[in-house]
C-alpha cells in the first residue's frame, strides 16, 4: 500500500455512557501528541477530541489518513467512524487501549492497528505507507 499522505485527522470519539474518564478530569493526550509530532513533520493535521469539540465529518471524509483512538466505552463509535472513513477512501489507523488489547477486533475496521504507546510506531507506519514498504 503506497499512498501519498498529506492530510491526517486524529479522532477520539465521545462515549455515550459513563466511563473511566467521566468523573475524573484526566486528559487523553495520545491524539494531541501524535498530531503535534506529525504537524512538526509538515503534515496538515486536525485533531478532534469529541468531549471538547464536535467532529467535523467533512474533515474526516477528506483526509488521506484517519487515526481513531478507542477505549472500551468508545469502541462502537470508534469502529463506526473508522468504517465511514475507510469507505471514503482514507487509510485508517486505530490505536488506544481497547485496540491495543483487542487488535484483531480493531483490524476488522482499520487498515492498521498501533498497539501500546504510538509515538514512534505511528511515525514509522506513516513513513512506510508513503514509501510502500512492507505491505505486500
Language-model features: where?
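C-terminal accessory regions of radical SAM enzymes
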Residues: 2-18
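Glycine-rich beta-alpha loop elements in corrinoid/cobalamin-binding modules
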Residues: 6-7, 34-136
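Proline-centered helix-kink/hinge sites
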Residues: 13, 27-28, 91, 103
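Glycine- and acidic-residue-enriched helix-capping/strand-helix junction motifs
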Residues: 17-31
